[in-house]
Amino acid sequence: MRWLLTTLSIQWVITGEKLNPKGTYLVLANHQSWIDIMMVMVVLGKGTTLPRFFMKWELVYMPVINICAWALDFPIMRRYTQEDIKGRPELKNRDFDYAHDVLSRNPDQACVVVNYAEGTRFTPEKHRKNRSPYQHLLKPKVGGPQLALDCLRNRLDGIVDITLAYPGATLSVWHLLSGQVPKVMIHVETIDLPEGLEKTPETLAELKAFRGWMNSIWAQKDARLERMLNGTPEDDHRSP
């Protein structure tokens, strides 16, 4: 993956921190295209264990993707609706139990879990329907990050915010491989989990506090994306 992408005619601008290759991390990233997965693997794959992505159940029907997901032991989420759970209450915690089982395997090994908190890829139409207060992002959902934190809490070394930007590019795997993504900007930054948010929210006030923390991260990410899309890197950059 790294060899393929680093041989393409792309101007790479990667800024921010390098992670401990033996660390266990929860990664929060914005999501615009399928190529985001490749980019996260490029920026993390050299120094850390191979990232694992929370994946929607619908994607298991897609060739290649399903094989990779099973082989790499991705946590695959069905995301049951309230109607589903009403008819079958036992489904309420099934995603959590499954993810916890997957991410609890080999607890002595480093683990990097990537969650796209927006829950779907950004498009102008989704942005309009989402009524997002952000210019370049959809509103973050808290369920995925909470689930990942619950699964990794006892061995988590840090939370990582990754911001992906593709100035002036049309985003698809074909555009990437045909040389039509001229520039990729990636910023990596570790963030702290505020005191009081270490445990799973159990009350409305705790849920509100967790949501407020996620919204503050997204506000900073949105401002960073604006700078990156205007061609301004966050600091001194490095090669992939």
Labelled PLM ranges:
Residues 91-105:
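A Trp-anchored, charged/polar loop motif used as the substrate-binding/catalytic surface
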Residues 32-36, 94-95, 139-143:
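Short, glycine/acidic-rich beta->alpha junctions
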Residues 22-24, 48-50, 108-110, 156:
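A general structural motif
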Residues 15-16, 28-31, 54-58, 116-118, ...:
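Short His-Asn-centered micro-motif
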Residues 1-25, 39:
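Membrane-anchoring hydrophobic helices of lipid-metabolizing enzymes
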Residues 198-240:
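Accessory terminal regions of nucleic-acid processing enzymes
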